[in-house]
Every structure is written in structure tokens, then in C-alpha cells.
Amino acid sequence: MQRNRVLAFLLLAAQLLVKIPETCAKFPALIVFGDSTVDSGNNNQISTVLKSNFQPYGRDYFDGKATGRFSNGRIAPDFISEGLGLKNAVPAYLDPAYNIADFATGVCFASAGTGLDNATSAVLSVMPLWKEVEYYKEYQTRLRSYLGEEKANEIISESLYLISIGTNDFLENYYLLPRKLRKYSVNEYQYFLIGIAADFVTDIYRLGARKMSLSGLSPFGCLPLERTTQLFYGSKCIEEYNIVARDFNIKMEEKVFQLNRDLNGIQLVFSNPYDLVSEIIYHPEAFGFENVRSACCGTGYYEMSYLCDKMNPFTCSDASKYVFWDSFHPTEKTNAIVANHVLKYDLSRFQ
């Protein structure tokens, strides 16, 4: 059933690439947690090497501004916010250019490079997930002071909470740090992460959140950075990693079912991007892409963050032909397609 829906979506791709439909569900705000897939600039304000607030990042964003989003333009939450009838971009909570009035209709607490496992955030000195929750608590206090208890509580309970996290736990942590490989099997580590995700959902539920979309993992074995390690084997996807992503998604979906059963009044939707992103990767021409093996920025094989800079002479001129912007992150066009799918098939389930 899921695959049929993705294939139907593929056939309509030419019409749906950048047109973001408004979903029938209405939310007063979009509140975002997670990693670089959804970080709109929080890492700009912390001491870490993982930043993207410089050109050519953001070259296709409004006014060509590099905001700290890991893309050439907007990221999925921006398009989702627009599709919900809210703002066309979700502001980062730590950005001093914004205040609580801006955050009342949307706010991002995500930090690029973070993961469910606290050890993942330590690799690049970024915000751990628990810190994102602490900022969310602070936000609630500020919101109540700004709007009053009743209105603020209404926004907190009726908002859509978008959660996208998990890839870094494998690529920056489990497969990079030998001690994790020794301590856990892949299966055990997956359950360890899912337990943390369940605790996180429960934590923000207790703080008043009720409507949440929890994203699964994409086929991260097909990221250009991972393909580069297979350069002498035709730059193939690392199927071992893709199997891990699929298995993780199956386990996470089971946990989502359990949480919906156990937490009274919660509406938790599992948003699985795996099949859609796989279709984009294996049938790029159907979506108007020409290059899926390498990224637009630099050589496209390994550049990310500071290695993806405006002095690199190899950066492509038209990012819309590429699935990936840098070796780890999608282009604005890919983000729009994914957001469109989430709006059409996942968020439409909210009542």
C-alpha cells in the first residue's frame, strides 16, 4: 500500500515539485526538534565547527541569505509551515533577530549534528536533544508571559510538533566510534535509540504537546558521502546502511503504535521518508533530477560545512538538477518534494 502511494506520487511529480498544497488540518504553530535536516540556524549561535551560515549555503534562499540551513535554500519544515498556512520559513530559537512574537507561530529547536544518543551530539559539540527540550521549556515560559496562560496553553496543545532525528547516531557515532560497536549489536543500538525517542515523546507530551509527526530514516547508505567510500565499486549505495535504516523504521513504527495506545489524547504520526527518497534516488529523472550520485557543492563527493565554501570552483550552477546539495544534505528542490509528500500523506491524518 505504501509503495503504491509513493509510485502514484512519482507519476504526479512534475506537477508537485515545488507547489506546496495547504493541508486541511489547521495548527496555530509548527514546533521543530531534531538535527540538520530541520535546523534553521541554531548552530550559528553555539560553539561548534558544524555550521552553514556562509555562502554558497542559502544562495537560493530569500535574498540569497545563508541562514545556517544545510541547503541551498529552504528546508522541509519551511515548506511544511507554508503548506499549513503559516510562515514560509521557521525561525531558529537561538537567532537573536527573532523574538517571542515571531516564535508564536513557529519555532525551531533543532541542532545540526545531534542525535538521540547524547554521545552523538558530543562528537561535534552540538546541542544534545535534552538541551532542545530545555529551550522548549523556556519557550513555554516566554509564550505564557507574552500571550497569557490560556492562549499559550492552547498553542502548546494544538501546535504540530515535527521531529526529525536519528541518522547521525549511526554515521557519526555507531559506525565511527569503536566503543559503540563493541557495546551494542546494531539491533540492540536501534532499540536503545528508539527507547530514547519514546522518552522524548513522553517528555514533551507531559509538557503539553499532543500532535506530533516523528520522521523515520531515509536510505542514508545512498548519501554522496557514503557513496564516495564505494568510489572504486561504481559509487554504489551501501546496502548494509540502508537495511539498518529500514529495520530502524519498522521498529520505530511499532513504538509509535504503542505510544498512541499508552498516552491518552496523543496523536503521534510516523512519517516514513524511506520509500519516497528511494524512488527519487533510483528514478531521479521522474522528478526532474539529473544527478543523484554526487552533490552540487564542490566536487560533490565529500564536501560539507566549511569544506563547502564559495571559493570551491567545482560547485554546480543549477542545484535544481541535483538531489543533494552537499555530501550529506538534500537540495531545496528535494526538500520541497519530501515536504509535499509529508503534507499529502502524513499530516492529512491529523484530525
UniProtKB/Swiss-Prot annotation:
It comes from the Eukaryota. It comes from Arabidopsis thaliana. Belongs to the 'GDSL' lipolytic enzyme family. Gene3D superfamilies: SGNH hydrolase. Its main location: secreted. Residues 1-25 form the signal peptide. GO terms for cellular component: extracellular region. SUPFAM superfamilies: SGNH hydrolase. Keywords: Glycoprotein, Hydrolase, Lipid degradation, Lipid metabolism, Secreted, Signal. This is GDSL esterase/lipase At4g26790. InterPro entries: GDSL, GDSL_lipolytic_enzyme, SGNH_hydro_sf, SGNH_plant_lipase-like. The active site is at S36, D326, H329. Pfam families: Lipase_GDSL.
